[in-house]
Design a protein with these regions (language model features):
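Short beta-strand/loop segments at the ligand-binding rim of alpha/beta enzyme cores
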Residues: 18-29, 94-103
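Alpha/beta catalytic cores of nucleotide-metabolism and tRNA/nucleoside-modifying enzymes
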Residues: 76-97, 101, 107-162
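Short, small-residue-biased leader/transition segments that mark boundaries at the very start
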Residues: 1-8
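Generic structural signal for well-ordered alpha-helices
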Residues: 9-13, 35-39, 89, 112, ...
Length: 162
C-alpha cells in the first residue's frame, strides 16, 4: 500500500489543483492499509472518501479446467464483500476527519445501518438497485423506522458507535 499511497497522494494533489469543487476520492480495497491511504488523500485536499470498490476475485470452471472469466480475474461485488467493506469503513472513519461514504454489499436498510454504525457519513447502493429498483426507498423507510423504535432523534447519533 505504501507505493499505492504515493500514487493516491500525487493524483489527489493534481486533481485538487485543477478542481476547486467538492472532490470525493474512491479507495480500492485491494490494499494492505486503506486507512493510511485515506489519511494521505485527506492531507492532499480530498473532501471525502468513498469505499470500497470491488475485490479482486477468480472462479475456475473445473470441468473445462480453465478460468470462468476470459480476463481470468475480475471484480467481486454485492453481499459477499460487505464484511470487508464494513471493516474498512470502520478503519478509515477512525483515521480521518473528512466524511466517509460506505459502499459494498448494501442490500437492505440493516446493511446501510451497519455502515453508518461503523462510521459512514453516507452510503451508496449499487448491486441492490438491479434486484429491487426501489432499494433506496426501502433503506430510508427502514432507517426511519429503526430510529423511531430506538428513540433516535437523528441518524447521525448512530454514526461510528461501534
Amino acid at each position: 500500500s505504501r507505493g499505492l499511497g504515493d500514487v493516491y497522494k500525487r493524483q489527489t494533489r493534481a486533481c485538487r489543483r485543477a478542481w476547486p469543487r467538492t472532490m470525493i476520492v474512491k479507495l480500492s480495497p485491494n490494499v494492505t492499509d486503506i486507512a493510511s491511504i485515506a489519511c494521505a488523500v485527506e492531507a492532499e485536499g480530498a473532501d471525502s472518501v468513498s469505499l470500497i470498490n470491488t475485490l479482486l476475485g477468480m472462479a475456475v470452471d473445473v470441468e473445462r479446467q480453465r478460468p470462468v472469466l476470459s480476463t481470468v480475474t475480475g471484480g467481486l461485488s454485492g453481499p459477499a464483500v460487505k464484511p470487508v467493506a464494513v471493516r474498512m469503513v470502520w478503519q478509515v472513519a477512525k483515521a480521518v476527519k473528512i466524511p466517509v461514504i460506505g459502499l459494498g454489499g448494501i442490500m437492505t436498510g440493516a446493511d446501510a445501518l451497519e455502515f453508518i454504525m461503523a462510521g459512514a457519513t453516507a452510503v451508496q447502493v449499487g448491486t441492490a438497485n438491479f434486484v429491487h429498483p426501489d432499494t433506496g426507498t426501502r433503506i430510508v423507510d427502514y432507517l426511519q423506522d429503526y430510529c423511531l423504535r430506538h428513540g433516535v432523534a437523528d441518524i447521525s447519533e448512530l454514526r461510528g458507535i461501534v
